[in-house]
Design a protein with these regions (language model features):
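Conserved catalytic core of two-metal-ion nucleotidyltransferases
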Residues: 107-148, 280-327
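Short, conserved charged micro-motifs
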Residues: 99-106, 272-279
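Long C-terminal interaction/binding lobes of large macromolecular proteins
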Residues: 142, 171-174, 199, 375-378, ...
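Eukaryotic intrinsically disordered, low-complexity regulatory regions enriched in Ser/Thr/Pro
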Residues: 204-207, 362, 366-370, 376-448
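Active-site nucleotide-donor binding segment shared across nucleotidyl transfer reactions
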Residues: 47-99, 221-272
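Phosphate-handling catalytic interfaces
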Residues: 149-173, 331-354
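Arg/Lys-rich, intrinsically disordered low-complexity tails that mediate electrostatic binding
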Residues: 448-498
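N-terminal regions immediately upstream of nucleotidyltransferase
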Residues: 1-49, 156-223, 421, 442-454, ...
Length: 498
């Protein structure tokens, strides 16, 4: 309990300890100081011009903003997360040509009279940061053309600027909440924003006839593949995982939605081992016609995967995660089974919406997302069993800042002979338009060398100039002496005659 003598109004709540009160005061001070710093930037007479150049560039190029700036744009005024009067806008946007766009935008600022401009690679490969007069103006992130086109198509247009749609924003936040090995200090802020988007943009699918196009797997094949995945500690996130969540669905008649399993979807860091185990177990059942197709990752949205077909029917997808996703371990028929958390499943299902492939039924995916959210909201924060949400463990690699720096260092050694190439700049761009212009001018300056004359026959053997001058002087003196002697002789001669 806080001492009664404490006068600070932040400490009037009975449940606050003295330490809690200290932290509340500290947080308020941090917020106030940040506000003062932001106001200094916003009062800069050049800042409005800087911002106008940026927003016009985004409009003209039809780039797609994401992150906090997009969340703020799609929320109503009463719930916006940024204030236009006290917060510096933080523009993060996608581009299918991020490197060239970063340079082009830097050049525009330079032509408009700004001198201190720097476009440089971020820690994350494919992201470029732009600074103008030492103010961070933008983060430009590369997005492969097919995904970028899909984001453009689904984007929300506000005042001529494109922002990622609410489903993408939910996906990105669920992805961060599923990464229990990442920066969990951001979770509170991320979860608050997630709830705001969910409040104004809930899943509205009615889930009618979601199984109309489902062709269930034969029972023996389904059981064999499921057990092989359990044996290899895979994490379930498809229909089998949904069947575990469906036990908590209200009303009860909705629980049969996931009884016909279309296919098994799992996460594994060793997909090849699972594939071999599945083949082995199916062969033991006398099933031979097995085909495996490999699908490359789609940007950083959907990881590389393997599609398993039996008798030309798809039975399973095995995804190899490129980041850590949390899951719960539950007991099913005396077996420990790994089931992806709600956030892990949401991050994948919502990402599938942007792939535009026939195996991903948009309406069914939206229905499953709605059911997951409803289950969680109806659980009264049970937070046990499969309903645990913010938990370890997680499956997949977790790349720390140190890991990324090590990777960049090894890339620098690999690419040091390719400086100036696009491949090099993707990792190590450091572009300053003013310095670049100086380099270009210097490279075109003609170096004038002293003119060397080819010696001619008449001058090739001449005495050096200094010696010739000295010799001439001596000749004049000698000539003068001869004249004096001649005159003296004349005088003496005439004298004798007189």
């Amino acid at each position: 309990m806080v001492n009664e003598n404490v006068k600070n109004k932040l400490c009037v709540k009975d449940h606050l300890t003295f330490e809690d009160c200290e932290m509340a005061i500290l947080r308020l001070a941090i917020k106030e100081n940040a506000k003062v710093d932001a106001e200094k930037v916003l009062k800069n007479p050049n800042f409005n011009k800087m911002l106008s150049i940026l927003t016009n560039f985004i409009r003209r190029k039809k780039l797609v903003c994401y992150g906090g700036i997009a969340i703020n744009a799609v929320l109503p005024d009463e719930d916006k997360i940024y204030s236009t009067e006290t917060d510096i806008p933080d523009y993060d946007f996608f581009s299918s040509n991020a490197l060239d766009d970063a340079k082009e935008l830097a050049d525009i600022y330079y032509k408009e009279g700004f001198q201190n401009i720097e476009a440089k690679s971020g820690v994350h490969v494919g992201t470029f940061k732009l600074f103008v007069d030492y103010v961070a103006m933008a983060d430009i992130s590369y997005m492969p053309v097919p995904l970028f086109n899909m984001l453009q198509k689904q984007a929300v247009n506000v005042d001529g600027i494109l922002y990622t749609d609410p489903n993408y924003l939910k996906m990105a936040m669920a992805l961060e909440l599923s990464n229990s090995a990442g920066d969990v200090t951001r979770w509170e802020k991320v979860f608050k924003r997630y709830k705001l988007i969910e409040k104004y943009y809930p899943f509205k699918t009615k889930c009618n006839d979601v199984n109309r196009n489902i062709h269930p797997i034969a029972d023996n094949i389904y059981e064999t593949i499921k057990n092989a995945c359990i044996d290899k500690n895979a994490v379930f996130l498809g229909d089998y995982a949904m069947s575990q969540y469906s036990q908590y669905i209200q009303p009860h008649n909705l629980r049969n939605y996931f009884k016909p399993v279309a296919d098994i979807d799992v996460l594994s860091e060793e997909p090849e081992e699972i594939i071999e185990r599945i083949k082995e177990m199916l062969n033991n059942e006398g099933i031979q016609n097995i085909k495996v197709l490999k699908h490359d990752a789609l940007g950083e949205l959907v990881p590389m995967s393997y599609q398993i077909l039996v008798n030309n029917d798809t039975c399973a997808y095995i995804y190899k995660p490129f980041r850590c996703h949390n899951y719960n371990v539950i007991d099913v028929n005396h077996q420990h089974v790994n089931i992806a958390t709600i956030d892990t499943i949401l991050s994948f299902y919502l990402a599938f919406l942007y792939i535009n492939k026939p195996q991903y039924d948009t309406e069914r995916l939206m229905c499953m997302c709605k059911i997951l959210v409803d289950v969680y909201n109806q659980s009264n924060l049970a937070n046990n069993g499969v309903l645990k949400r913010f938990e370890l463990p997680c499956i997949g690699p977790q790349h720390t800042l140190s890991d990324m720096k090590k990777e960049k260092n090894s890339k620098f050694i690999e690419l040091k002979g390719k400086k100036g190439t696009k491949e090099y700049d993707m990792y190590f761009l450091n572009y300053n338009p003013g310095q670049q212009q100086e380099k270009e001018i210097n490279s075109h300056v003609v170096q004038i060398k002293p003119r060397t004359r080819t010696p001619s026959r008449s001058t090739s053997n001449k005495t050096p100039f200094s010696k010739r001058v000295l010799r001439t002087k001596r000749r004049r003196v000698a000539s003068r002496n001869k004249t004096y002697k001649h005159k003296a002789r004349k005088l003496s001669f005439f004298g004798k005659r007189l």
